[in-house]
């Protein structure tokens, strides 16, 4: 049993002096893990870094086996990811959310394409809060919990959407939500309108609170949100506005 695909390096865990288990997100087969040998060779040290895009080859005697992998580097992003703390927190938070939200060998083609886009955003120095939250919303959607933020879940109107129902994940208009606002989640304007960016730190905090609620309730269950996510938020709030 073997296959070849384009992949992104998500995780590397050393198991012996010269062996490691590497986990990747493939374009056509979902998350896959395998053993790499000769871990500390000059070539492999360069290839198996978090965020790198690789030509991925997996082989095993049976499909259910862990298997071994061999990769060739397509494009390296590892230096850019390590170049500053925000890039590092941004990438590691999304990696951990991806690994915690999906089982291995589930196909999520949309997720792979979004990952490529985010890596390229790091490459051109264009990572931002809106991209990050939209990625979290995509992870929720791919995990089966899509939020509907473009119209009111009660009236179907598209104006004055300022709340989200914690039960349905649907936007709620100001008029409908006013009597129940203490039970509702805040909906930042920049998640409703494509041409908007966060106006202040309160909108940023509200966006992180919104996705965190649905991750905790429906996806992660007893797992904790990544520490990198908390550090990312702190770094954003410390240097924004």
UniProtKB/Swiss-Prot annotation:
It comes from the Bacteria. Belongs to the RecO family. It comes from Orientia tsutsugamushi (strain Boryong). GO terms for cellular component: bacterial nucleoid. PANTHER family: DNA REPAIR PROTEIN RECO (PTHR33991:SF1). Keywords: DNA damage, DNA recombination, DNA repair. Involved in DNA repair and RecF pathway recombination. One of its GO terms (biological process) is DNA recombination. The lineage of its organism: Bacteria, Pseudomonadati, Pseudomonadota, Alphaproteobacteria, Rickettsiales. This is DNA repair protein RecO.
């Amino acid at each position: 049993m073997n296959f070849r695909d384009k992949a992104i390096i998500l995780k590397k865990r050393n198991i012996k002096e010269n062996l490691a288990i590497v986990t990747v997100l493939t374009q056509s087969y979902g998350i896959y893990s395998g053993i790499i040998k000769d871990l500390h060779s000059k070539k492999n040290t360069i290839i198996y870094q978090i965020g790198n895009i690789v030509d991925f080859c997996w082989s095993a005697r049976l499909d259910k086996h862990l298997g071994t992998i061999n990769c060739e580097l397509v494009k390296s992003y590892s230096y850019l990811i390590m170049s500053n703390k925000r890039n590092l927190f941004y990438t590691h938070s999304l990696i951990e959310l991806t690994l915690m939200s999906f089982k291995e060998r589930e196909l999520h083609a949309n997720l792979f394409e979004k990952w490529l886009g985010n890596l390229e955003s790091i490459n051109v120095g264009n990572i931002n809060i809106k991209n990050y939250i939209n990625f979290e919303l995509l992870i929720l959607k791919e995990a089966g919990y899509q939020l509907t933020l473009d119209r009111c879940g009660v009236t179907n109107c598209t104006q004055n959407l300022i709340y989200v129902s914690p039960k349905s994940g649907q936007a709620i208009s100001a008029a409908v939500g006013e009597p129940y606002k203490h039970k509702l989640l805040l909906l930042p304007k920049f998640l409703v309108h494509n041409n908007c960016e966060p106006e202040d730190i309160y909108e940023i905090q509200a966006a992180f609170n919104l996705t965190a609620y649905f991750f905790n309730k429906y996806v992660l269950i007893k797992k904790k949100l990544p520490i990198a996510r908390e550090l990312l938020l702190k770094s954003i709030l410390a240097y924004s506005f």
